[in-house]
């Protein structure tokens, strides 16, 4: 189920279970995982498959393996806050994922996270090819970190 309110999302979470975040792109998905205490967000991996059934199966495997209790999906909106074509694509993906899992899904504003992730990797001296392979997972960890920071105050 897609939850629009962060407090409601938090209320539905199981104590001491991790969250995952997804940075959904047209060519790849970045995945990040929190620790059980939800104090740290870590890039997990990048899914390069574009077939939605395979992507959802991969996500279900991650959810089962790490005993995840909630999912955060980065919602790409433009700088003015307007909905874009990519926003609609991500919302449709979130709806499809919600049909496959019985976990709360929260959509988090992800403006500029992939660019920030790429800049962060660049500042560490990561080569362009490696940045492009990892920036979505790092962006997902930034999205997750934003939510983790917000729920500390709930």
Curated annotation (Swiss-Prot):
It is an enzyme of class 3 (hydrolase). SMART domains: YqgFc. Its EC number is 3.1.-.-. GO terms for biological process: rRNA 5'-end processing. Keywords: Cytoplasm, Hydrolase, Nuclease, Ribosome biogenesis. GO terms for cellular component: cytosol. Gene3D superfamilies: YqgF/RNase H-like domain. It is found in: Cytoplasm. GO terms for molecular function: nuclease activity. NCBIfam families: RNAse_H_YqgF (TIGR00250). Could be a nuclease involved in processing of the 5'-end of pre-16S rRNA. Belongs to the YqgF nuclease family. This is Putative pre-16S rRNA nuclease. It comes from Rickettsia peacockii (strain Rustic).
């Amino acid at each position: 189920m897609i939850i629009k309110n962060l407090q409601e999302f938090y209320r539905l979470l199981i104590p001491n279970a991790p969250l995952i975040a997804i940075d959904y792109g047209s060519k790849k998905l970045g995945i990040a995982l929190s620790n059980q205490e939800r104090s740290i967000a870590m890039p997990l991996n990048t899914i390069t498959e574009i077939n939605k059934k395979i992507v959802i199966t991969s996500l279900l495997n991650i959810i089962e393996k790490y005993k995840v209790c909630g999912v955060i999906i980065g919602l790409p909106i433009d700088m003015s806050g307007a909905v874009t074509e990519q926003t609609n694509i991500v919302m449709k993906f979130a709806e499809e994922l919600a049909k496959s899992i019985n976990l709360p899904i929260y959509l988090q504003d992800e403006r500029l996270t992939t660019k920030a992730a790429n800049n962060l990797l660049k500042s560490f001296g990561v080569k362009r090819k490696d940045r492009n392979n990892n920036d979505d997972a790092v962006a997902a960890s930034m999205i997750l970190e934003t939510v983790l920071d917000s729920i500390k105050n709930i």
